């Protein structure tokens, strides 16, 4: 029961509790329950392979809700392009989306980076009162940094 992987998960759970990061606490608890109930490897592989896409879909739904409820309309979209902040927001949204795409690809090629990204995010939340922006974007930044390192070599 107390394997290395379980101890590792418990460490993340403890850090999530210290950081008061509900997303991490819930995620670790779900994975621990899957492990305790001996959910088969195929189900775990499916979650690992498709989980990020499922998460992106849920985030996209949440982003679209203000449009569906009428809180955001075409007037708001047009007004956003009348300010520097609107254009900067557009550029930032595009950049983050591209970084996230690169991050998903990078995590698939180098899964070990996921652990350090999650751990780094947790440390920033605990030590610097940062906000967990997500390992996908962090992986995209790591990807860009690794591309820069490869270019310099």
Swiss-Prot record:
Main location per the UniProt record: membrane
Membrane topology: Multi-pass membrane protein
Keyword Transmembrane tagged: yes
UniProt-listed InterPro entries: UPF0756_TM
Keywords: Cell membrane, Membrane, Transmembrane, Transmembrane helix
Pfam family, one: DUF441
Family: Belongs to the UPF0756 family.
Protein name stated in the entry: UPF0756 membrane protein lin1603
Source organism: Listeria innocua serovar 6a (strain ATCC BAA-680 / CLIP 11262)
């Amino acid at each position: 029961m107390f394997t290395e992987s379980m101890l590792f998960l418990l460490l993340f759970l403890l850090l999530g509790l210290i950081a008061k990061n509900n997303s991490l606490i819930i995620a670790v608890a779900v994975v621990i329950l899957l492990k305790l109930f001996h959910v088969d490897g195929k189900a775990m592989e499916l979650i690992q392979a498709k989980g990020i896409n499922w998460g992106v879909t849920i985030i996209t739904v949440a982003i679209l809700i203000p449009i569906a409820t009428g809180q955001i309309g075409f007037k708001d979209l047009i007004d956003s392009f009348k300010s520097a902040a609107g254009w900067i927001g557009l550029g930032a949204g595009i950049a983050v989306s591209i970084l996230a795409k690169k991050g998903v690809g990078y995590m698939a090629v180098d899964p070990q980076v996921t652990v350090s990204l999650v751990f780094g995010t947790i440390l920033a939340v605990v030590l610097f009162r940062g906000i967990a922006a997500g390992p996908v974007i962090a992986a995209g930044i790591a990807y860009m940094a690794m591309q820069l390192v490869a270019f310099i070599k």
